């Protein structure tokens, strides 16, 4: 394949797999494409990496669990029933040369506005809903990139499936904090009917690596200071 040829030609030490169909795009694709990208490709790539002595870092999602209240531990059995969650679950790799990180991320996009933060920024000065009972334990893309750098440098042998998680926060509170940090002038209406709780427990990863996840205020301060590139795209 072209991917295998590219890997053979470049001879990387580490491959970070960022290929995948996100949940917001699932309605515009079919199940075959979702399974090919989210389920099959990670295992094909992991096999190439294992044979070539290349480390692979792969991303899974909190959506391998249903949004039922309760803390989800890495030892718990995933129970997703939707195409996205199932396709990502099937794509989790666990080889001696790979690490799968279950997490969720918020950050900027180069194109479009499907993600939570990009959507909120695109709504500047308008009224939006804030979901009090949608509980989130993801990370900013800024912070995740720093963790990946540390994993590459300080934990070259770490393999397996782990969960990265921040302190739980409601989508209402998260959007409110983003509104304050970026001065979006949003009017946020409290919405309480929708319920979704995919709280991940990241204790095992934090204890193993001594990598602590900052508070949301600290992550958002860092995020707010990194806007100039995206504002000029």
Locate each region found by the language model.
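Glycine-rich NAD(P)-binding loop of the Rossmann-fold in SDR/ketoreductase-type enzymes
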Residues: 29-44, 78, 82, 86-89
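Mid/C-terminal beta-alpha module of Rossmann-like enzyme folds, strongest
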Residues: 145-150, 154-196, 200-202, 231-232
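NAD(P)-dependent short-chain dehydrogenase/reductase
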Residues: 81, 93-136, 140-150
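Conserved Rossmann-fold NAD(P)-dependent oxidoreductase catalytic core, especially the SDR/UDP-sugar
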Residues: 43-79
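NAD(P)H-binding glycine-rich loop region in Rossmannoid oxidoreductase-like domains
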Residues: 1-37
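Active-site beta-alpha loop architecture of Rossmann-like, nucleotide-cofactor-dependent enzymes
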Residues: 21-25, 64, 107
């Amino acid at each position: 394949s072209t991917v295998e040829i590219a890997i053979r030609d470049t001879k990387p030490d580490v491959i970070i797999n960022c290929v995948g169909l996100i949940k917001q795009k699932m309605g515009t694709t079919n199940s075959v494409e979702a399974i090919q990208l989210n389920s099959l490709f990670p295992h094909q790539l992991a096999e190439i990496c294992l044979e070539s002595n290349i480390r692979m870092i792969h991303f899974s999602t909190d959506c391998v669990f249903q949004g039922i209240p309760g803390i989800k531990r890495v030892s718990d059995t995933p129970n997703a029933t939707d195409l996205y969650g199932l396709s990502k679950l099937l794509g989790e790799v666990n080889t001696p040369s790979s690490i799968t990180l279950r997490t969720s991320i918020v950050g900027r996009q180069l194109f479009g506005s499907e993600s939570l933060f990009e959507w909120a920024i695109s709504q500047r000065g308008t009224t939006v809903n804030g979901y009090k009972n949608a509980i989130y334990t993801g990370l900013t893309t800024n912070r995740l990139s720093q963790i990946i750098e540390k994993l590459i440098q300080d934990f070259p042998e770490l393999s397996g499936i782990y969960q990265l998680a921040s302190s739980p926060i409601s989508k209402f509170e998260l959007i409110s904090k983003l509104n304050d940090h970026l001065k979006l002038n949003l009017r946020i209406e409290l919405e309480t009917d929708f319920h979704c709780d995919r709280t991940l427990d990241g204790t095992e990863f934090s204890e193993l690596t001594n990598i602590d996840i900052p508070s949301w205020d600290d992550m958002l301060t860092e995020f707010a200071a990194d806007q100039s590139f995206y504002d000029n795209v």
